[in-house]
Amino acid sequence: MPYRKYREKKYETKYREAFKVFQEKIGITFTDEKLLIQAFTHSSYVNEHRKKPHEDNERLEFLGDAVLELTVSQYLFQKYPTMSEGELTKLRAAIVCEPSLVRFANELSFGSLVLLGKGEEMTGGRERPALLADVFEAFIGALYLDQGLETVWGFLKEIVYPKINEGAFSHVMDYKSQLQELIQRDGSGNIEYQILQEKGPAHNREFVSRVTLNNVALGLGSGKSKKEAEQQAAAEALKKLKEQL
């Protein structure tokens, strides 16, 4: 056997073993291992191995992007029943953005599994954020095709959803959403907002709102609209609760 073929065979054996260990780590065994390998195959690797029937991960990335948006949207819709469409959209965007996907990929050492061309390898492609985010999406696409939506949901329940529950994305929420997220995480009870007062002429109205948790006042706020007053009340409540933590 020529040395080059021997080296390539040894390389592929090493990666197959790595993929086996990876599947054991995540507790999922692919029915079609080719899909798993394709998810981690960068176009630069395909370009350097044209004689072999390799496919890059770009189509899987396209599919995974859509599956990720759907599953995260469903999770947020169920978890935050009173959150507005705008806030849900903003929160979802923070979860599926490149830095977040890179964080998820790094947590599972995706970079070490990527099949790269020599040029991409030499320029640090294994650690390039855009590449890692693409691989994470491609993996979700491959997992969906191989196992279905339920398995994707189970995987995200282990890797992504706990970070939402831990407040990793609270910074993109408005005050009311942050307060709701904090209370839900703590399991403390129900939040209610009450407008205590309306004053001033019709063209310059001022509202005073109070937010309560299990009938205990947490904060007061005022504003030119009911929404603004509630936001300010939530901001005061958040400040108090965080001081107690």
UniProtKB/Swiss-Prot annotation:
The keyword Zinc-finger does not apply. Gene3D superfamilies: 3.30.160.20, Ribonuclease III domain. Its cofactor is Mg(2+). The keyword RNA-binding applies. GO terms for cellular component: cytoplasm. It catalyses: Endonucleolytic cleavage to 5'-phosphomonoester. Residues 19-148 form the RNase III domain. Disulfide bonds: none annotated. The active site is at 65, 137. It comes from the Bacteria. It is an enzyme of class 3 (hydrolase). Its EC number is 3.1.26.3. SUPFAM superfamilies: dsRNA-binding domain-like, RNase III domain-like. One of its GO terms (biological process) is tRNA processing. Pfam families: dsrm, Ribonucleas_3_3. Residues 174-243 form the DRBM domain. GO terms for molecular function: double-stranded RNA binding; metal ion binding; ribonuclease III activity; rRNA binding. HAMAP family: RNase_III. Homodimer. Digests double-stranded RNA. Involved in the processing of primary rRNA transcript to yield the immediate precursors to the large and small rRNAs (23S and 16S). Processes some mRNAs, and tRNAs when they are encoded in the rRNA operon. Processes pre-crRNA and tracrRNA of type II CRISPR loci if present in the organism. This is Ribonuclease 3. It comes from Bacillus cereus (strain AH187).
